[in-house]
A protein has these predicted regions:
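C-terminal and inter-domain tail/linker signature
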Residues: 1-259
């Protein structure tokens, strides 16, 4: 569908060693033109820009485990779809709720080669603590730990500014799944020459869609949100935050229950 797709590597936040194995989190900005028919419908000729974060485990010069999150919300919006409507249409194209391809859920997970969690660098620990506090509704942490002029890059290709923007994003997500279990699955921190201190976290929310928030009226659907976040730290706290999850996957899980 995207024969001219270009992958522009923005950052790689990594841990480990070639001998023992390496966990790396790659943030990629993709540009493409919708030139072929496929899962996104008939070729439209529209130009797209979206991000991907992929956590990869490699050893012996080979990647043997990967967790990839594409900003599908950004893709479908640029093609003229609403993410919810796209998910509903996709279910029908795949044969209905009983036959469609099921989004990933921990209940169907298979243990892969990598069972570690990253490294114990202080910057990764700090960001993990911040996210855990946010997900515990301790929103006072945001104006304390985020730069007043922070820029946040979020699902759907959205950009939000200031600690107020960060607060709004995380609050709306958590409000949709207030009883869901929050988990830190990968945690990496790094300091490199000519770069700000950075952290990469792969996280998840697993539970019921039982609150009003970013995903509308609560439905009670069982939902798994796989998310990934990168941050850069400055002298006044987090100055850039990049967070991705697949909105269409979440809407698909909701629509499979509601019909």
């Amino acid at each position: 569908e995207f024969p001219d797709r270009r992958l522009l590597g923005e950052d790689v936040i990594w841990s480990g060693s070639p001998e023992e194995g390496m966990l790396s989190s790659h943030r990629i900005l993709t540009t493409a033109t919708h030139l072929g028919d496929g899962v996104y419908g008939k070729a439209s000729g529209k130009k797209l820009r979206y991000r991907v974060i992929a956590d990869c485990h490699a050893i012996n010069n080979q990647i043997n485990d990967e967790w990839l999150i594409r900003d599908q919300g950004a893709v479908v919006r640029q093609l003229g779809w609403d993410p919810k409507e796209y998910a509903i249409d996709l279910i029908e194209r795949e044969g209905g709720p009983g036959k469609c391809i099921k989004p990933f859920h921990p209940s169907i997970d298979k243990t892969g080669p990598y069972t570690g969690r990253g490294n114990d660098n202080d910057w990764g620990k700090k960001y993990s603590e911040i996210l855990n506090r946010i997900m515990s509704a301790d929103l006072n942490v945001i104006p304390v730990e985020y730069d007043r002029a922070v820029t946040g890059f979020y699902p759907g290709g959205s950009e939000l500014y200031s600690s107020d923007g960060v607060d709004g994003f995380w609050t709306k997500l958590r409000a949709s799944f207030p009883s869901a279990t929050f988990s830190i699955d990968h945690q990496i921190g790094r300091e490199d020459p000519l770069m700000p201190p950075r952290a990469a976290i792969r996280w998840s929310l697993t539970g019921k869609h039982d609150g009003w928030g970013a995903f509308g009226k609560p439905t009670g659907a069982e939902v798994h949100v796989m998310g990934a976040s990168h941050v850069e730290f400055g002298p006044w706290g987090i100055r850039r935050e990049y967070t991705l999850y697949d909105e269409t996957s979440i809407w698909k899980q909701i629509a499979m229950k509601t019909g």
